[in-house]
């Protein structure tokens, strides 16, 4: 049984990789951006676990900037993806403009909360 | 006319000089009232009184039941110190009684009380008010069959040669009643105690039950320094001050050393110097505090300030103020309990200073110096100073602990900028 689950996992992983290779470059760039944001958030959480949460507002501000960035990037990816039937009629420029505006508001709030 | 004017100015300018007695600038007593049972004491104790007058004291001798004596008139004290050489007085004359003597001491004046083997209840009461208790048996004297002084006419071993203290050339002769001190009393001190072979009993009658006062619990000479720095000397032997004892030689029974002169004169001279504030008197002046690096005294400090506290302490040498040198004067920064306790360092010229950091607590603090040492007047200085917390713009602007968060926020902004460029201009 273990061998078959091992083989199944490997097969799954291979199919995932080949399917992912077929995605357009634009989306891959967005995925990279999201990964960078989440990675930065993880670094901050580990740092807080070591040092303690003393300037808690700064910690929240830093983590939320990463999380907010990731969330907005994911929204952009959803709206820009041509295979997504829900947003078929939305022009990608409109999606990008929303993305930029929301990021501006996010960074304004983050700078205020950073202390 | 000019001569008259000259004499007048001279006379008026000398008046303040006559009144400079027992002031804070010159703490030695000047005018001393000596109450005696009869004036024969003046001549039989002339050596002791002579030593006092030669040091500048103005002695006034009065009989203890003289109806004209009084310690104060119109609310002002006439004398700086009182000497009671009247062990058998039943009632003081004039306006003196136990309460007025206690008030006299309470106002900071000094007292010497000498009892003897026929001490009256009044003298015992005065001593009890001062904190020592004479033996209740009215006929008891201190007897010591081992440490007695060999003499020609005494056969009952009541003349004691005591050398239970340091730095005397010869033993001190004592003949009289003993007293005991309450061990809980921290103000009273035994100067000369009887040896462990002494006891207090009637020498003329047989002992029916064991004596209540024995051994070194018997104190022969005690001093009391009150909290207002008034000093009291209490002893149970008036003859200790007499010329006869001053001049006689001493030979302790059982030892072959024969001292030419007893240690009475030296001992009593030194202890009178202490009682009348010629020695062991301290004053602390010039309390200053300021921030390190500044020189004027601020009205308020902030937490975590560095400050410096300084004080000058002088000791009276009998004629002038000398710098007091010691390494155990401490200052407290006190609010309900001492937050900082620091030993002051001295420059050997009487100037003491210490530097410390204001604690991380705000409130109203006091700089307190509480200095009580054996034989010296107690110093109790206190200066109040408030301490405030940080103002809102006195905190650190950027916290080093939060640098990663600052970094991540800015890196997100940079990443967003780069990403928009890449996203827009890639195919």
UniProtKB/Swiss-Prot annotation, chain A:
Name of protein: Dolichyl-diphosphooligosaccharide--protein glycosyltransferase subunit DAD1
Q: Please explain the role this protein plays, according to its UniProt record.
A: Subunit of the oligosaccharyl transferase (OST) complex that catalyzes the initial transfer of a defined glycan (Glc(3)Man(9)GlcNAc(2) in eukaryotes) from the lipid carrier dolichol-pyrophosphate to an asparagine residue within an Asn-X-Ser/Thr consensus motif in nascent polypeptide chains, the first step in protein N-glycosylation. N-glycosylation occurs cotranslationally and the complex associates with the Sec61 complex at the channel-forming translocon complex that mediates protein translocation across the endoplasmic reticulum (ER). All subunits are required for a maximal enzyme activity.
Q: Does the keyword Transmembrane apply?
A: yes
- Which source organism does the UniProt entry give? Citrus unshiu
Q: Which family does it belong to?
A: Belongs to the DAD/OST2 family.
- Please report the record's description of how this protein sits within the membrane: Multi-pass membrane protein
Task: Show the stretches that span the lipid bilayer.
Answer: 32-52, 56-76, 95-115
Please give a single GO biological process term from the UniProt record: protein N-linked glycosylation
Tell me the residue ranges located in the Lumenal compartment per UniProt. Answer: 53-55
What's in the keyword line of the UniProt record? Apoptosis, Endoplasmic reticulum, Membrane, Transmembrane, Transmembrane helix
* Intervals, Cytoplasmic compartment: 1-31, 77-94
Q: Which InterPro entries match?
A: DAD/Ost2
Its localization reads: Endoplasmic reticulum membrane
Its domain of life reads Eukaryota
List, alphabetically, the Pfam families matched: DAD
| Single GO cellular component term | oligosaccharyltransferase complex
Give the multimer and partner information: Component of the oligosaccharyltransferase (OST) complex.
